[in-house]
Amino acid sequence: MTIKDNSQLFPLAKQQVNMRSVLAVMNAAEQLRDASSELIPSLLRECKKIDWIYNPLEYAWAPHAEWIRRFSGNGATTLLVGMNPGHGMGNTGVPFGCPEQVRDLLEITNLEVHQPNPLHPKRPVLGLKCPKPEISGRRIWSSLAQRYGSAHLISQTIYIVNHCPLWMFNQSGKNITPDKLTGPATQCLGSICNDHLLAVVDAMSIKRVIGIGRYAQRQVDALFKNLELGWVPHPSPASPFANRNGGADWRRAFEMVLEH
């Protein structure tokens, strides 16, 4: 079969739908990137708990865009929603992007990750070659790989985003989560994050949205009234449940949510 005969394997209409999905998700991410970066000075002024803000959509845009290009147009109808970046996405630009799994499972490699400016001395960014794993991301991606197989097969069912794109710390480098923020700029941030989530759901024709952790669950429950919704406890190593029985209890809970 020649290249011109590809339409017999992949109907043109389906190709166009997938490409429209990718372009719409990319556009939504670009808007979120730019709008959230514009809010950073106001957030730093108004929120006394935060002293440092990174936006991985800015400095790690290349791998994030690759994530969108390769995995947002493959037919997934279930969306997993996290809270905001941690060490994984903070280094790789991929939601829950444990560096080893971004490299080995997603095969996103050899893309430039810039340095945030200013850089917190206790929060270095090493990019895709970062040797330190993110336990939350490792738990999620290893469970998905065990259930579905390759990254492409995962993306035919599952896509992942974070509600908030910003990685925030206090002066000592302690992680500050979005639920700790207050002030008008925080309300603006929540609004643009909601707009992004709505755009992704619309672009991908998502049927089911699963919040990862209580914060994400609350955002999902408030936004979507006509979709199937779910929730799974956050896999953070700071969670006693996620650590129980070596993580087996969390994996079982995740499996049950995916099977529902």
Predicted regions and their residues:
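Short loop/helix-cap segments at secondary-structure boundaries that form the rim of catalytic
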Residues: 220-226
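A polyanion-binding, active-site-adjacent surface
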Residues: 4-208, 217, 240, 252-260
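Short, flexible loop segments at boundaries between secondary-structure elements
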Residues: 226-260
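Active-site metal-binding loops of divalent metal-dependent hydrolases
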Residues: 84, 214, 235
